[in-house]
């Protein structure tokens, strides 16, 4: 296959910056052992990723979700239930009590005679 350029892929993913992020994500997936959707033809992983995008063997939506999930620092679990109002009020009260300033020492200046 001829050299793959950004122009071959830009009609699939219009934003060049998104294209770079998604191609890099796909190249990392390939490096991690993901199955190729096209023949490698002695190309390196970034070129294979661009060829897959150009030939539409991977969808931009899948790549976008993969990019977003890798950039998230905190992953939301389905098991996590939202806190109840009572526990929120108790948490706020506990925070108020722990954040209160300690009582000031009334003996200013030390123990001098």
Curated annotation (Swiss-Prot):
GO terms for biological process: DNA-templated transcription. Belongs to the RNA polymerase subunit omega family. It is an enzyme of class 2 (transferase). Its EC number is 2.7.7.6. The RNAP catalytic core consists of 2 alpha, 1 beta, 1 beta' and 1 omega subunit. When a sigma factor is associated with the core the holoenzyme is formed, which can initiate transcription. It catalyses: RNA(n) + a ribonucleoside 5'-triphosphate = RNA(n+1) + diphosphate. GO terms for cellular component: DNA-directed RNA polymerase complex. Promotes RNA polymerase assembly. Latches the N- and C-terminal regions of the beta' subunit thereby facilitating its interaction with the beta and alpha subunits. It comes from the Bacteria. Keywords: DNA-directed RNA polymerase, Nucleotidyltransferase, Transcription, Transferase. GO terms for molecular function: DNA binding; DNA-directed RNA polymerase activity. It comes from Rhizorhabdus wittichii (strain DSM 6014 / CCUG 31198 / JCM 15750 / NBRC 105917 / EY 4224 / RW1). This is DNA-directed RNA polymerase subunit omega.
């Amino acid at each position: 296959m001829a050299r793959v350029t950004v122009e071959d892929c830009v009609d699939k993913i219009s934003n060049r910056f998104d294209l770079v992020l998604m191609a890099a994500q796909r190249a990392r997936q390939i490096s991690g052992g993901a199955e190729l959707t096209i023949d490698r033809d002695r190309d390196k992983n970034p070129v294979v990723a661009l060829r897959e995008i150009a030939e539409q063997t991977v969808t931009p939506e899948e790549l976008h979700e993969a990019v977003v999930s890798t950039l998230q620092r905190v992953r939301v679990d389905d098991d996590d239930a939202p806190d109840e109002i009572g526990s929120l009020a108790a948490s706020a009260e506990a925070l108020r009590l722990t954040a209160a300033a300690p009582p000031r020492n009334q003996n200013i200046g030390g123990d001098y005679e």
